[in-house]
C-alpha cells in the first residue's frame, strides 16, 4: 500500500506563502498557492512566492489545485505557478473569481475552474475531497477533508469564527481522522476571536458621531466588513465610493457575483464627491498597511488627484499592521493627524478583529476532529511550537505531534509517521517581470548600493599599445555630493592613477588584476578618510 506524503512548500516558519502538496501513489493535489510580502531587506522585490521545483519535476502527477480562500497569502502566486504546472482549480465562487482576475491581469488563460460549495465532494486522482464551511475575514472560506485509499484522512483546516460547520467536522472526527493540519497564527492569544459583528457596532457609533467625511482603510478582500460599512451608509444616509485599484477591482467583482450588495443610489464615483456635503460621504480605500502608493497614503500626502485629507475628516484604519509594516502605518497615522483628521485605529477602538482562531477555538477543533497525528502550519516557528504544546496539553502523545521544517516531507500510514526529505523548497523573488532571476547575490549588491552608494571608475586603454588614453574618470551616485567633496574625489582619482602607473602596458590578461587593485586601494583610501564603503566598479574600455 502506498503511503501518504505531506509536502509543505510554504507557510511553515512564516505567515504567508501558504502551499502544501499531498501525494499518494501517482497523484498529487496542491492546497493553496500563496505569496508573501518581501522583507525590508529584499530591496526592489515586489513579491515572494514558493519554490515549486518539486511540482515542476512531477508536473504530470499534479491532479488539482484546491483553494481554502482568496487571500493573497493563499492565491497570490497563482499567476506564476499555474502556467508552469497547470491543473484544474477548485474553489468557492469568490475564490475562483479572484484567481481568474489575477490570471487575467497576466494574460493567462486555458485554466480549468470548478466552483464548489460547502459539503461538495470532488475526486482528484486518488483523493476524495470534501469542502467544509469555515468562517474567516473573507467570504467563501472552506476547510477540506481529504480521503485517499487505505482510509487515510487529512483535515486541512484554517479554522475561524463561530459559524464553522462544526457538525461536519465532528462527523469526520467520529469516522477517524489520521492527521490534521491547522493554522497557528493566533495560537499565542488566549480566549476566542472577537466576532466580526463587533466591528459593525463600532462603525455604527462612529457614523453616528462623525460630522464630516468618513474615510475607512481596510483590506479589499474583507467583503463582510465592507458590507457592514455599506449597511451603515444606508442607515445614516451617506454615499460610498471606492479608492485604490484593488478596492475598486475586488468590490466590482464581488458585486457582479452577488457577494456584495450595494444599492445603486448609495454608490458614487470618486469624481462626484464634490456634488455632496462632507456629512454625506464615506470613502473606502486601500492603505491600511501604510503602503507608499496606496489610496490613503496619497491622500495623507496630498498626492491624490481628487482627494486630500482635511479638517473634520474621520479616518478609520480597520486593520492591524502586518509584521514589518508597523513603522509605515505609524507614519501614516502621524501624517493624518497633521492634516487635522480624527484618526481611529485598533489601539483606541474596536475597528478590527482577526480572521484567525485563538486558543479556545483551536482547542475546540482538536476536540471535535480527534486526529491521530497533528501538524501545525501557517505560522512562524514559535507559533508552530506553541500549537504543538497546545495539542499535547489536550492529551495528544508527544510523538504524534509533528513540527515540520521547510524542505521536509511527512510520510504517513495508519501505523507510523516518518519525516523524509530533502525536498527543494524556499522563496522565489518576483521583481517586475522577472521571476526567480534575483537571488541573494543581487540583493546583497542592492543593499550595498543603498547603504554607501556607487563609484564607477572609467579608464580608456589603447588596444594596440596598452597605454592609458583617458581617465581615470570617476562617476559617483549615492556616495557624496561631488561639488562639495572635490578634494576627496581628486584623491580617489589619484589612487586609481597610481594603480594604473604600475603597468608599462595593460593587456587584456591584466584587466582583472588592474580592476581588483583599483577596488582594494580606493576602498582603503575612502574608508580611512570617511569610514564609508561604497561599491566600486572599475570599467576598462579599449580605444
PLM segments and residue spans:
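A glycine- and charged-residue-rich anion-binding loop/surface
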Residues: 12, 36-40, 61, 345-348, ...
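RNA-binding accessory domains that recognize and position tRNA/RNA substrates
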Residues: 1-5, 481, 511, 515
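Conserved hydrophobic residues forming the short capping helix/wall of the S-adenosyl-L-methionine
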Residues: 103, 391, 526
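His/Asp/Glu-rich metal-coordinating catalytic cores
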Residues: 2-66, 71-276, 294-308, 327-331
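C-terminal tails and terminal domains of large nucleic-acid-associated
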Residues: 507-543
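Short Gly/Ser/Thr- and Asp/Glu-enriched loop/turn motifs at secondary-structure junctions
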Residues: 117, 405, 532-536
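Hard-cation-handling environments
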Residues: 189-318, 322-491, 495-507, 515
Amino acid at each position: 500500500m502506498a503511503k501518504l506524503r505531506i509536502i509543505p512548500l510554504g507557510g511553515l516558519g512564516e505567515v504567508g506563502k501558504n502551499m502544501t502538496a499531498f501525494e499518494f501513489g501517482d497523484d498529487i493535489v496542491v492546497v493553496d498557492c500563496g505569496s508573501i510580502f518581501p522583507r525590508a531587506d529584499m530591496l526592489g522585490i515586489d513579491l515572494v512566492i514558493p519554490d515549486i521545483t518539486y511540482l515542476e519535476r512531477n508536473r504530470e502527477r499534479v491532479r488539482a489545485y484546491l483553494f481554502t480562500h482568496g487571500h493573497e497569502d493563499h492565491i497570490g502566486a497563482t499567476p506564476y505557478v499555474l502556467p508552469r504546472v497547470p491543473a484544474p482549480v477548485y474553489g468557492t465562487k469568490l475564490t475562483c473569481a479572484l484567481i481568474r482576475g489575477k490570471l487575467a491581469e497576466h494574460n493567462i488563460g486555458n485554466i480549468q475552474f470548478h466552483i464548489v460549495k460547502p459539503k461538495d465532494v470532488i475526486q482528484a486522482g486518488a483523493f476524495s475531497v470534501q469542502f467544509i464551511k469555515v468562517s474567516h475575514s473573507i467570504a467563501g472560506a472552506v476547510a477540506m477533508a481529504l480521503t485517499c485509499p487505505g482510509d487515510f484522512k487529512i483535515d486541512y483546516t484554517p479554522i475561524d469564527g463561530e459559524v464553522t460547520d462544526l457538525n461536519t467536522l465532528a462527523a469526520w472526527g467520529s469516522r477517524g481522522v489520521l492527521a490534521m493540519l491547522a493554522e497557528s497564527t493566533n495560537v499565542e492569544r488566549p480566549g476566542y476571536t472577537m466576532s466580526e459583528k463587533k466591528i459593525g457596532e463600532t462603525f455604527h457609533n462612529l457614523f453616528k458621531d462623525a460630522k464630516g467625511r468618513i474615510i475607512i482603510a481596510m483590506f479589499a478582500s474583507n467583503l463582510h466588513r465592507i458590507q457592514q460599512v455599506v449597511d451603515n451608509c444606508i442607515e445614516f444616509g451617506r454615499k460610498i465610493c471606492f479608492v485604490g485599484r484593488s478596492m475598486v477591482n475586488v468590490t466590482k467583482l464581488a458585486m457582479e457575483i452577488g457577494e456584495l450588495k450595494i444599492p445603486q443610489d448609495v454608490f458614487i464615483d470618486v469624481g462626484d464627491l464634490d456634488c455632496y456635503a462632507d456629512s454625506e460621504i464615506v470613502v473606502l480605500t486601500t492603505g491600511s498597511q501604510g503602503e507608499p502608493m496606496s489610496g490613503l497614503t496619497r491622500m495623507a500626502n496630498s498626492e491624490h488627484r481628487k482627494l486630500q485629507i482635511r479638517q473634520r475628516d474621520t479616518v478609520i484604519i480597520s486593520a492591524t499592521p502586518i509584521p514589518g509594516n508597523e513603522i509605515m502605518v505609524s507614519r501614516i497615522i502621524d501624517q493624518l493627524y497633521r492634516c487635522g483628521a480624527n484618526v481611529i485605529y485598533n489601539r483606541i477602538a474596536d475597528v478590527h478583529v482577526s480572521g484567525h482562531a485563538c486558543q479556545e477555538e483551536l482547542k475546540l477543533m482538536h476536540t471535535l476532529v480527534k486526529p491521530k497525528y497533528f501538524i501545525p502550519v501557517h505560522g512562524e516557528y514559535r507559533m508552530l511550537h506553541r500549537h504543538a504544546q497546545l495539542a499535547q496539553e489536550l492529551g495528544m502523545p508527544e510523538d504524534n505531534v509533528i513540527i515540520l521544517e521547510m524542505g521536509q516531507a511527512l510520510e504517513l500510514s495508519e501505523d507510523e509517521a516518518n519525516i523524509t526529505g530533502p525536498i527543494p523548497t524556499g522563496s522565489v523573488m518576483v521583481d517586475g517581470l522577472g521571476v526567480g532571476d534575483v537571488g541573494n547575490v543581487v540583493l546583497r549588491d542592492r543593499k550595498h548600493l543603498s547603504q554607501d552608494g556607487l563609484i564607477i571608475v572609467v579608464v580608456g586603454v589603447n588596444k594596440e599599445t596598452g597605454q592609458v588614453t583617458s581617465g581615470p574618470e570617476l562617476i559617483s551616485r549615492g556616495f557624496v555630493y561631488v561639488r562639495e567633496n572635490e578634494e576627496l574625489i581628486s584623491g580617489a582619482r589619484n589612487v586609481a592613477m597610481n594603480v594604473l602607473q604600475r603597468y608599462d602596458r595593460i593587456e587584456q590578461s591584466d584587466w582583472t588584476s588592474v580592476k581588483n587593485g583599483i577596488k582594494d586601494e580606493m576602498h582603503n583610501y575612502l574608508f580611512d578618510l570617511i569610514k564609508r564603503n561604497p561599491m566600486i566598479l572599475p570599467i576598462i574600455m579599449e580605444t
